[in-house]
């Protein structure tokens, strides 16, 4: 029975968050006043001031970007930036999508009223004027662990509601995510946040858009625009000094995920598990191969290692090895198009969404990862498969690389073919890295590893899926027992996805000369038809 379950307004009093870093005193206040009548404030800055000294903030970290008139401008972190913040409302309440629909809707209305979201609440009142019978919830398909809804009410702008998963497979560093959202908001990027609750948030819903498809990605004109859009992202959001000097976030995540998998000793010691899913003889062989690949990339590769060894730092910065703020997951569901004809779409009509994996990486990681997505068709019956025949041909990659380099070129000088060739080769050398990233993600998401509490410092990011057009939506309905299982529509074959990625990973390591083609420890391999250009 769910009688009297729904939240009352007094249970959900709002707090206001200022996105940045909280002092211990502020954190203590927050805990003491979670259910008080007056909102408390938490100061979280656009950039984490704990990561900077005054010297760091005075050092210019210039980034080139364009203004609304298309003119070149520069920006950098300054002491003034460190004092900027994003003001967010927060309410101490949880929403449970497993409740019967009418109770769930009433809880949503109560939280919306407490957050005082304009239009969705009555100013100065504890009671909402909204009728739960007129509220429509439409669940967005494709989110693999988080539950995402479009909320519609007559004559009100629709909202997007995310309810975070609470299992080990949906653990995300929400504190870092808040800082990322704050930074994106400072540059008018990312989700337009309306308010937070304990296990989720409300965002502005992007009307009149559709998610991109595999066909969009492989279209030459569209691919050029995507390259330019990525360049704009990379040139808009500066990194902190710490982010520039630390190792790329991809390697940090690898360390965390491998440590997590390795902690399941019974699973990793079973060579049948390893052979079936990682396409090799043993866990030890996998670990050795991963270390050998990383060592090869930084010490012996033809282009990455050469650029890192050069004294001319400009050569490295102008290549794909420059550390930038990356999206790290630009797949079909995370790129929205304004609903126009394909020929009418401009770079400004593209919107990148879902920054849960965003962070500092070399340019080449973002580019190589995106081009891998040409092989995926998440709308296909076999959505886990990697269609290797769809991977971009040499000319496609060269055009993509040239479009990226030439866009927002400060000197308006056409880039030499040598720089395009270098970026092309970096994309190939880093391709195993981006393949393996999502292979391990899929293994952790599969549920085949026994669940256990995370070791301190570990984090497992999730939700490799997007949102957008109405074809990815379904009505929220109750099961016969009055409960709604938000996972019942999740039929993605994680282990199949893992195996497909591993086959390409091993094929790449053979082609690049990291391991021998006749190595008896490797199982099924797939080979992509691109080679380095010398």
Curated annotation (Swiss-Prot):
It is found in: Cytoplasm. SUPFAM superfamilies: Protein kinase-like (PK-like). InterPro entries: Choline_kin_N, Kinase-like_dom_sf. GO terms for molecular function: ATP binding; choline kinase activity; ethanolamine kinase activity. It catalyses: ethanolamine + ATP = phosphoethanolamine + ADP + H(+); choline + ATP = phosphocholine + ADP + H(+). Pathway: Phospholipid metabolism; phosphatidylethanolamine biosynthesis; phosphatidylethanolamine from ethanolamine: step 1/3. The modification Phosphoserine is found at residue 23. GO terms for cellular component: cytoplasm. CDD domains: ETNK_euk. Keywords: ATP-binding, Cytoplasm, Kinase, Lipid biosynthesis, Lipid metabolism, Nucleotide-binding, Phospholipid biosynthesis, Phospholipid metabolism, Phosphoprotein, Transferase. Induction: Induced by zinc-depletion via the transcription factor ZAP1. Expression is sensitive to intracellular zinc levels. Repressed by inositol. The keyword Cytoplasm applies. Its main location: cytoplasm. Its EC number is 2.7.1.82. GO terms for biological process: phosphatidylcholine biosynthetic process; phosphatidylethanolamine biosynthetic process. It is an enzyme of class 2 (transferase). Gene3D superfamilies: 3.90.1200.10, Phosphorylase Kinase, domain 1. Transmembrane segments: none annotated. Present with 3420 molecules/cell in log phase SD medium. Catalyzes the committed step of phosphatidylethanolamine synthesis via the CDP-ethanolamine branch of the Kennedy pathway. Also exhibits choline kinase activity, thus contributing to phosphatidylcholine synthesis via the CDP-choline pathway, but its preferred substrate is ethanolamine. Belongs to the choline/ethanolamine kinase family. This is Ethanolamine kinase. It comes from Saccharomyces cerevisiae (strain ATCC 204508 / S288c).
